[in-house]
């Protein structure tokens, strides 16, 4: 592991000499190479899917793992979108002249070597490799064993493009050890790795956070809520709630708990139940919810659970303050939404919720680097330092100060 990471670290010096135009050209070549290698990538993914069936992976994990022609095309498009982004490094973020006549520039620079630990999403391999290359970082990829064949096939395609352009293949490094022991080694290698971004289940993220000596940017879990206010447009509220839960329930920006203002609960809950029943959603509710519609009881544990499945908690709350109180207690700081036509209430929610992303009249499913216009994302951070929310190109940079003098001493 150490020799592997030492090679990755050494390769980072090459990136300083690559122009933005050359990086963009190479990224476009990577996108075309992914398209040209679709058959090989899908063949590798089929092996992973066979293993998934044998190992009884959950439907949510299988959905994340599965690749088809459209998803490979989506990977290629994401790489092209990353190529089209503004050059993130070498930008002068601020500048001034001191009383001593020193000219100071605050300039964006790459972080260095970024370790990405992820589970069952093969597209993370191409997304994070492209984002890292665009931002002049080396990426060290540690995928889960359930996607090992797919990750190896994708990384092979990208590394071949690097080699063709005379660049070290170590700029995109895939750790061959897909075991938990491999994670344990990687997160201690602060001599070679500058940042760790874990993407996966709550257990993985907690393990990395508690054991890493390398700085970590993470989200704990996607405990997302939608609050339907008494001044909501009911038709919009139902559409948004269905999308937030049902469109793709196995992802971190899917809603897990729906909060409904007591003032409109009797009107809107029967309509919501009809819509969720049609979507085959398993509903659990608080006592007041159970008095209005027929649902299973929701426990305190349920309100603290990230289901990643088509299961939804419902709680009736006393206005926006009741919604905020619930989210403060159970939220994970990921994404929260209010549905209301009342601007004052909306602002109270926006200002009262401490989360990476807070919505008014929109689905939490938009918390995504692509949806934000970032091209793709390395992950979604609930940290408050360095990066927060969908972590795109800018989250992969830091800064340094360049100071120009003319002989000044102190």
Swiss-Prot record:
It is found in: Cytoplasm. It comes from the Bacteria. GO terms for cellular component: cytoplasm. GO terms for molecular function: glutamate-5-semialdehyde dehydrogenase activity; NADP binding. It catalyses: L-glutamate 5-semialdehyde + phosphate + NADP(+) = L-glutamyl 5-phosphate + NADPH + H(+). It is an enzyme of class 1 (oxidoreductase). Keywords: Amino-acid biosynthesis, Cytoplasm, NADP, Oxidoreductase, Proline biosynthesis. Its EC number is 1.2.1.41. CDD domains: ALDH_F18-19_ProA-GPR. Pathway: Amino-acid biosynthesis; L-proline biosynthesis; L-glutamate 5-semialdehyde from L-glutamate: step 2/2. One of its GO terms (biological process) is L-proline biosynthetic process. Pfam families: Aldedh. Catalyzes the NADPH-dependent reduction of L-glutamate 5-phosphate into L-glutamate 5-semialdehyde and phosphate. The product spontaneously undergoes cyclization to form 1-pyrroline-5-carboxylate. Belongs to the gamma-glutamyl phosphate reductase family. NCBIfam families: PRK00197.1 (NF001221), proA (TIGR00407). PANTHER family: DELTA-1-PYRROLINE-5-CARBOXYLATE SYNTHASE, GLUTAMATE SEMIALDEHYDE DEHYDROGENASE. This is Gamma-glutamyl phosphate reductase. It comes from Sulfurovum sp. (strain NBC37-1). The gene is proA.
């Amino acid at each position: 592991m150490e020799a592997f990471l030492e090679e990755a670290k050494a390769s980072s010096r090459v990136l300083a000499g690559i122009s933005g135009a050359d990086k963009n050209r190479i990224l476009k070549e990577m996108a075309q190479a992914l398209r040209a290698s679709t058959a090989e990538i899908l063949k590798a993914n089929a092996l992973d899917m066979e293993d998934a069936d044998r190992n009884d992976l959950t439907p949510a994990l299988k959905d994340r793992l599965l690749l088809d022609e459209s998803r490979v095309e989506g990977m290629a498009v994401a790489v092209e979108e990353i190529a089209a982004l503004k050059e993130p490094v070498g930008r002068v973020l601020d500048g001034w002249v001191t009383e001593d006549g020193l000219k100071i520039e605050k300039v964006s620079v790459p972080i260095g070597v970024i370790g990405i630990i992820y589970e069952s999403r093969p597209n993370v391999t191409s997304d994070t490799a492209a984002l890292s290359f665009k931002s002049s970082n080396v990426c060290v990829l540690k995928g889960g064993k359930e996607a090992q064949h797919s990750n190896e096939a994708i990384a092979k395609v990208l590394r071949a493009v690097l080699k063709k352009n005379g660049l070290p293949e170590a700029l995109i490094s895939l750790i061959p050890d897909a075991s938990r022991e491999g994670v344990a080694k990687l997160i201690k290698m602060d001599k070679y790795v500058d940042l760790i971004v874990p993407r996966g289940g709550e257990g993985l993220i907690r393990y990395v956070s508690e054991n890493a000596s390398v700085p970590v940017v993470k989200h704990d879990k996607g405990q997302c809520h939608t609050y339907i206010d008494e001044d909501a447009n009911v038709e919009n509220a139902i559409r948004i709630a269905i999308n937030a839960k049902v469109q793709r329930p196995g992802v971190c920006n899917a809603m897990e708990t729906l909060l409904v203002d007591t003032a409109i609960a009797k009107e809107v809950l029967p309509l919501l139940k009809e819509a969720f029943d049609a979507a085959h959603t398993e509903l659990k509710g608080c006592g007041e919810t159970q008095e209005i519609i027929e649902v299973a009881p929701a426990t305190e544990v349920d309100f603290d659970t990230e289901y990643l499945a088509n299961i939804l908690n419902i709680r009736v709350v006393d206005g926006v303050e009741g919604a905020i109180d619930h989210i403060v207690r159970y939220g994970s700081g990921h994404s929260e939404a209010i549905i209301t036509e009342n601007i004052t209430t909306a602002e109270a929610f926006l200002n009262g919720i401490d989360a990476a992303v807070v919505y008014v009249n929109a689905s939490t499913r938009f918390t995504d680097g692509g949806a934000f216009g970032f091209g793709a994302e390395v992950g979604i951070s609930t940290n408050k330092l360095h990066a927060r929310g969908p972590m795109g190109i800018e989250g992969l940079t830091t800064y340094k100060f360049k100071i120009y003098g003319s002989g000044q001493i102190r």
